Amino acid sequence: MKNHMSDMSPEEVRQLVRKGQMTGPTAGMAASYAQANLVVLQKDLAFDFLLFCQRNQKPCPVLDVTDAGSPVPAIAAPGADIRTDFPKYRIYRHGVLTEEVTDITPYWKDDDVGFLIGCSFSFEQALINQHIPIRHIDEGVNVPMYKTDIDCVPAGPFSGKMVVSMRPIPERLAVRAAQVTSRFPAVHGAPVRIGNPQSIGISDLHQPDFGDAVTVREGEVPVFWACGVTPQAVIMEAKPDIVITHSPGHMLITDIRNESLAVL
């Protein structure tokens, strides 16, 4: 199933998601295409959030912003509908996670603005092409994600700590992994830390704040990349009336080819 899904087109995956036939994490799916995180908030907060993303481009690289009231990401995936095409969503009310759903159409408002934020799943195929293993794909689980003590630059009501994703990499390949991913700044780029998780406030790799723990083997080093789940941690601090996000690991498959995001 994994290999079959990796060969699908973005539209094929989105159709499965839209029909409710695929509700799990999207790592490895439509492998040549960029995946996106989601934040939906009301128009009166959209400028401050866009400013937050501009000031924090490492964790929050913006791939597309919808027109107010429109669920169509006209640049990233013109045939998509952000209300139905993510496998799972989270509803936050006053900073508290209250619901997890597979369709946000009932929650959609005429002044809602959707932000698509780059996802590190998008550079995983480039790592695989360099024979660098991706443990969460191999183990069939969600990527582990952790809150750090790295401060984001505030904007309006939005402030908080960066969230990172972690992939165990053989020590001899860690520098190569950094080189490969540095080509993709639109989907988080180079790592923010190689090894020493305590230095960024992570005390236990076996207890991720989001996603699932993975095996770190002898001779491997944990490598951390800025993560598009950062807005969810920030939203918990800002406590707006309602914000909708993707569920961590459950992304939109866009029509943007991964290689088109590479800078070298």
UniProtKB/Swiss-Prot annotation:
Q: Name one Pfam family in it.
A: D-Glu_cyclase
What organism is recorded for this protein?
Bacillus velezensis (strain DSM 23117 / BGSC 10A6 / LMG 26770 / FZB42)
EC number(s) given by UniProt: 4.2.1.-
Any one Gene Ontology molecular-function term assigned to this protein's record: lyase activity
| Name of protein | Putative hydro-lyase RBAM_004300
Q: Which UniProt keywords apply?
A: Lyase
- Keyword Lyase in annotation: yes
Q: Does this entry carry the keyword Disulfide bond?
A: no
Query: According to its UniProt record, which protein family does this protein belong to?
Result: Belongs to the D-glutamate cyclase family.
